[in-house]
Amino acid sequence: MKFNTIDEFLKHYVDLNYRYDILYLNDKEMYKDLFEYAYARKMNAIYQSLLGYLYKYGEGVEKSETSSFEWFYKAASNGHGYAMYELGLIYVKGRCVQQDLNQAFSWYSKSSELGVDAAMNNLGLFYEKGIACTRNMEHAFALYLKAAEKGNKSAITNVALCYRTGNGVPLDYNKSFYWYQIGAEKGDSVALNSLGYMYENGYGCNKSLEQAFNYYLQAAEKGLARAMNNVGFFYDRGMSVPQDYKKALYWYEKAAEKGEIYAMRNVGLFYKDGLGTSVDLNKAKYWFTKAGEAGHPSAMVHLGYMYEKGNGVVQDYKTALEWYLKAAKLGNAVALSNIGVYYEKGYG
């Protein structure tokens, strides 16, 4: 939301519960005036929080994590819920202060008590993971649900996931589907992708690969890497769309460049086998290595095989065995079989 005046900006800053990240001034020079306006009212918690954001993003003033923390702390000490949430984030990340998860838990708790949905969601994560507290999945779900009912996108997908997996609440695909729909209607990429998963598997709905592809594509176009990989897979296998290796590779590469581990392996396979492109063993090795280093066992096996046979690399039994061993530790059956052959023949 963009505004032409400071008064409009400040009105929406309060009305939208201090969501500074979605508010903008059309004229960048006006941020200096906004800073001066807020600084002149620095004894008020609302303006203390605003100064925290201005220092955080370096708008109207030189960016300073330390100054941002100081102003958020003043605002939080004066009862500002969103400033408390920001302090929680700072203590989690350990930016300009030493990381302190106990402090983060404390500030998230205080912020949650004041109804800040983002803090509720993050506090739910702490309870789910047992961070700075005893793990309590039921309490985590309750916090997710409160935040979701306030419209928090992350919490909405967390509630849906809890229902989908039966984590902290009885498994219920219908309720999971319901919450994913709400998230998708808000344009949340994770919810869109997850709704695609529900349609692909017929969870809480009639199975529809066409609908699944549609939601995967929407999420992919919003930049979600795992959705890009899913779109690539549908083109790869010809699921509800004509098989098209070029389109599959296009989406796999977009996902791989974002660090999606399965996409990295898939790109490696496409370059190894010349699917949608010409064979390029150098690129195959590059992507298998990226995926292998990220922990994908199948990519480790493919990379090991390249070294074993000298495909695109200098033949090296020792390096091949190292990759097979890494994959075997992750339970890959092919790697275990290959290691058996290695020891039998004395390779490596």
Where are these regions (language model features)?
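Canonical positions in the second alpha-helix
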Residues: 37, 74-75, 110-111, 146-147, ...
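N-terminal alpha-helical interaction modules that lie
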Residues: 1-39
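Residue-level detector of alpha-helical secondary structure
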Residues: 7-10, 35, 145, 196, ...
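Alpha-solenoid helical-repeat scaffolds
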Residues: 27-59, 70-77, 86
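Hydrophobic face of amphipathic alpha-helices that form TPR/SEL1-like repeat modules
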Residues: 48-57, 84-93, 120-129, 133, ...
